[in-house]
Amino acid sequence: MIRLACIQIAPVFLDAKKTWEKLKEKIVEVKSNGAELVTWGETLIPGYPQWISPSGGAKFNNPQQKKAYAKYWQEALHLEESKIIEDMKTVAKKHKLMFMGGIIGAPSKN
């Protein structure tokens, strides 16, 4: 049987690096309690695009939403080049853990 830990934390909104650092602290904590598989919520990194619902849905020509989406996309993790993804791999290997969690991914910049 695998021991699962589900981490429920608030992100450092639209800051992927700070959210990962916060999450990493919790990962080390749950590992010390015997976790083998660690999961976390949808789009934790860099945060859920909460501006969609209160603003009446996705309005892509709205200047405020364009600005918010630009920041959201900027904070997405480029899967092949992300230092955060590399650190996730390092942490998982070091602590002999499996991760299954929500991130916003982006294609390679190259």
Where in this protein do the model-derived segments appear?
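Cys-nucleophile CN-hydrolase/nitrilase-fold catalytic domain and related Cys-dependent amidase chemistry
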Residues: 16, 28-110
